[in-house]
Amino acid sequence: MAYHIKREDYVKIYGPTVGDKIRLADTDLIIEIEKDYTVYGEECKFGAGKNIRDGMSQNQFACNNSALDIVITNVVIIDWWGIVKGDIGIKDGKIVGIGKAGNPNVMDGVTPNMVIGPSTDVISGEGLIATAGAIDTHVHFICPQQIETALYKGITTLIGGGIGPTEGTKATTCTPGAWNIFKMLKAVDNFPVNIGLTGKGNSSYEKPLIEQVKAGVVGFKIHEDWGATPTVIDTCLKVADEFDVQVALHTDSMNEAGFVEDTIKAIGNRVLHAYHVEGAGGGHAPDVLKVVQYKNIIPSSTTPTMPHTINTFSEHLDMLIFCHHLDKNLEEDVEFAKARIRETTMAAEDYLHDIGAISIINSDSQAMGRIGEVITRTWQTADKMKKIYGRLPEDTQNDNYRVKRYISKYTINPAIAHGISQYIGSLEPGKIADIVLWKPAFFGVKPEMIIKGGFIIASKMGDANASIPTPQPVIMKKMFGAFGKAVYDTAVTFVSGYFYENEINKKIGINKKVLPVKNCRNISKENMIYNNQLPKIEIDYKTFEVFVNGNKINVPPAVSLNMTRRYNLF
């Protein structure tokens, strides 16, 4: 017999369904559920008196080879491909299905490969939001404590370079040379996150670059502090093309070896990832932003300029002087710093993100950026732009399109750009189960739980001496997946194809699983999902005013931001 339930009661029990809307944190961003994979009346739910019991939603005949290891029930999923509600099935550390889990012997509509059995444990996703683990592709490995900070904010993959607090690492994301690379690969072996190292790409001779690829780097960083000349760019891209790795570029702020046009000429038709294209983080002054126009250049922004506020400009001067080893008592050093900081390009950056012209947001960790703010800054920018411009033309009664555009900036697009999208970057069957769970009220600020390779590695947790898990203080803590040898199965070290094929990990004693980057050279900005626009950019060299497709861009700085004081004491 059919039983009708009030919508508000249904939401309390099973979470929202099709047509229901959710506010993200305290922003003005509203999502709407596009599809619900469940069969009404056949929802799976764990607990006393609920239906995930033997012979009901749990198939008593399903052995380990056919049952899920873990199921997340009735969770809202936000991903580039949709905003939906359903169950997430995990097996052998990978997502095997997004749909309807349960017992097909007694339930209708159970998705193949999503059988709940005696081998299955349950994470209740009712009322929660699931997203793919974030990917930060601009990490200065200055201190190991960054990794835990990033993890607790929902970042499960770090790509960048460095060897600790050296002058080079504090300024550039380079792990230079085989000896340093091997030491860093060993150093990160026990961290419960995915990591890929970038080598130093600044060489006008190919052999030192080839040595670094063979030592395992997933790409190169070309940085002006090491000399970002046209010859260096050309040489590095030749090696990258030969070995199928990516190149990240921080261009020549002082225009010593050429202007932005010379850099574009040196790049040719080859693909690369252009860091902090607004320019405050470094790059041809005042017009590095022009690289956004080209389909073979994948542009990104870093957290310190996102979004543009009344405080952004003023905090940059001291930050820049320290990070690039300048002397505030030397006039020429101060002038160099000032030349890189322009409010007009900072304002235009927000606009270009909102129209999908800048593809990625990453941190620039401890080198003018904050690793724990990648996700928060992304959604603050989206919220700021909605407050100013209203809904996007593609949105009607919700903000689904804008939300898909912005979540792609730190999930699927960096994965595509760096050759790891076949493994991670979205919640899709066949990919590693790197999943972050959020309460809607805390979305983008403080996760509830972080699943890495199908196993819980971090979660909010109360007093360990309490009778239940919830008594205060409730803080994010590492869970069992972050300890012991479990890390070797749940986390991955990304390496070059050469390193992987020659099993160099075994020769140097790496225990963690290694996977090769692929398809770094046959992509373009056109592959950046929801973020592949190629607007015409012009910059007035006297006033630094920015024109996009002929229109002057004048986005006001934010006076206050959401997702801030309501959530944090400091």
Curated annotation (Swiss-Prot):
Binding site for Ni(2+) 2: 221, 250, 276
Cofactor note: Binds 2 nickel ions per subunit.
Organism from which the protein derives: Caldicellulosiruptor saccharolyticus (strain ATCC 43494 / DSM 8903 / Tp8T 6331)
Cofactor field: Ni cation
InterPro entries from the UniProt entry: Amidohydro-rel, Metal-dep_hydrolase_composite, Metal_Hydrolase, Urease_alpha_N_dom, Urease_alpha_subunit, Urease_asu, Urease_asu_c, Urease_Ni-bd
Binding, substrate: 223
Keywords tagged on the record: Cytoplasm, Hydrolase, Metal-binding, Nickel
Protein name: Urease subunit alpha
Post-translational modification summary for this protein: Carboxylation allows a single lysine to coordinate two nickel ions.
Residues engaged in binding Ni(2+) 1: 138, 140, 221, 364
Gene Ontology BP annotations: urea catabolic process
GO molecular-function terms, A-Z: nickel cation binding; urease activity
The organism's place on the tree of life at top rank: Bacteria
Record text on subunit structure and interactions: Heterotrimer of UreA (gamma), UreB (beta) and UreC (alpha) subunits. Three heterotrimers associate to form the active enzyme.
PROSITE patterns listed in its UniProt record: UREASE_1 (PS01120), UREASE_3 (PS51368)
Catalytic residues identified in the record: 324 (proton donor)
Pathway: Nitrogen metabolism; urea degradation; CO(2) and NH(3) from urea (urease route): step 1/1
Reaction(s) catalysed (UniProt annotation): urea + 2 H2O + H(+) = hydrogencarbonate + 2 NH4(+)
SUPFAM superfamilies: Composite domain of metallo-dependent hydrolases, Metallo-dependent hydrolases
CDD domains registered for this protein in UniProt: Urease_alpha
Enzyme Commission number(s): 3.5.1.5
